């Protein structure tokens, strides 16, 4: 370990990563298949988007998902606009989804 490098706590490191992700991936368009979809009583939706090469967790908060017009189901092909974020307490990278539509519907 280099002596000139500061020793970070896990929380400090996660916050730094979260900040970097938020700056670098402020807006992304992503397509994929919905899996593990769950709508909670709070109104928030939690799901994963996946393709043949990987998957990423997603959250869509109530204020945004009220504008979607349909309830996604596992297996749906969708396109989302989102920002990349990290849930700092667990170190999980996720998409915070701002809009969602069925894939191939145009815009």
Regions from the language model: what does each represent?
Residues 1-107:
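Acidic, two-metal ion nucleic-acid-processing modules in DNA metabolism proteins
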């Amino acid at each position: 370990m280099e002596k000139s490098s500061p020793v970070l706590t896990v929380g400090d490191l996660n916050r730094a990563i979260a900040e970097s992700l938020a700056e670098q991936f402020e807006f992304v368009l992503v397509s994929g298949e919905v899996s593990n979809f769950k709508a909670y009583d709070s109104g928030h939706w939690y799901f994963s988007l996946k393709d043949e090469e990987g998957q990423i967790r997603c959250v869509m908060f109530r204020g945004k998902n009220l504008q979607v017009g349909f309830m996604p189901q596992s297996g749906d092909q969708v396109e989302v606009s989102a920002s990349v974020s990290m849930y700092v307490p667990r170190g999980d990278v996720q998409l915070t989804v701002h809009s969602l539509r069925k894939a191939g519907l145009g815009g």
